[in-house]
Structures are given as structure tokens and as C-alpha cells.
């Protein structure tokens, strides 16, 4: 008589139950993440709008000719760094809005989405940092105009333009910091919970 072996199901690893304290911590961290991302969305949007609308026209006196003036208009496309900052802020705002929608409609994140958010959080943080740093350097050169650079002191002629530009630089730096904190949270969720539970647990 042939022996029939009954296949034994392989032991499955069961995730440990989530304690009430862990659930409360997950909820609090998720709430913090959502607030950070919403603030980053607002700052990126403000940066983009303020820069795009930054335009000023002034009459400039020609040196050596007392009665001769020319009309000059400056806008954000005066320097490629400002155009880069507008693009970076727009991408940051769009990406943040996408993550906010995903986080609101779904209580859990799959591993693939968690990796996607982690990678793009890092990427956009560095893109925003590079854009803000480059724009700040160009703005500094335009405001102080070092003699060795042979630059014109733009801010002495276009004060409102520079003030509006300065406001956009501040909001861009704030958005960079907010993205950095969000990136840290997404890294925590991914690497601490990959083998335990989805990034955002229900409950």
C-alpha cells in the first residue's frame, strides 16, 4: 500500500498585533506628515505665483546724459536660475498635491507606493534646495553687484522687483525644509515598517 503524504502548509509569518500606543503614534505621525505636505504645497504655490508675477518697469537715467532716460522692464525670466526655481516649485506643488490625495483616499500605502514617495521626496528636496541656492546667489549678485563681477545693482533701480523676489526666495527655502522633514518621515515609514505592516495602518 502506497503511503499518501499530506502536504503541510508552510508556516506563514504573522505580523505582530499593533498596540494601542503604536496606533496612536501612527495616527499622530500621519497627521504631522499631512500638515507638513500641505504647508509645503502652499509654500511651493506661493513661490511660483510670486515669481511669475514679479515684474517691474522703471525709467533709468543714462550716465552722462542728464535729460536722457530709457525705460527698462525686469521680470523673473531675467535669470535662468529664477526660471529653474519656478519650474522646481511647480513640480514640488504638483507632486505634493498628488501625495496628499493618495494619503487621504487610502489609509494604507503599498510597498511600491511607499518606495515611490520615499524616492521622490528625496529627489524633489534636493531639486528645490539647488534651485533656491542658485536663485539666492543670483539675487545676492544683483543686490550687491561686486565690482569684480561687473554687475549692475538691479535692486537700487527695481526695488519692488527685488522685494518680491526676496519673498519668493524665503518661501522656497521654507518649502525645502518642509520637504526635508517629509522625506525623513517617509524614510521612517518605509524602513521601519517594510516587513511589519503597511506604512499607514488602519484604525
Swiss-Prot record:
Name the family. Belongs to the Casparian strip membrane proteins (CASP) family.
Specify the protein name. CASP-like protein 2U6
Membrane topology, as annotated: Multi-pass membrane protein
The record's annotation in Pfam families points to: CASP_dom (PF04535)
Topological region Cytoplasmic:
1-31, 106-111, 186-203
Q: What is the lineage of its organism?
A: Eukaryota, Viridiplantae, Streptophyta, Embryophyta, Tracheophyta
Which species does the entry assign this protein to? Selaginella moellendorffii (Spikemoss)
- What does the UniProt keyword field contain? Cell membrane, Glycoprotein, Membrane, Transmembrane, Transmembrane helix
What InterPro entries does its record include? CASP/CASPL, CASP_dom
Q: How does it assemble?
A: Homodimer and heterodimers.
- Membrane spanning stretches: 32-52, 85-105, 112-132, 165-185
Provide Extracellular-side residue ranges. Answer: 53-84, 133-164
Chain positions carrying an annotated carbohydrate:
67
Q: Which GO terms describe its cellular component?
A: plasma membrane
Q: What subcellular compartments does it reside in? A: Cell membrane
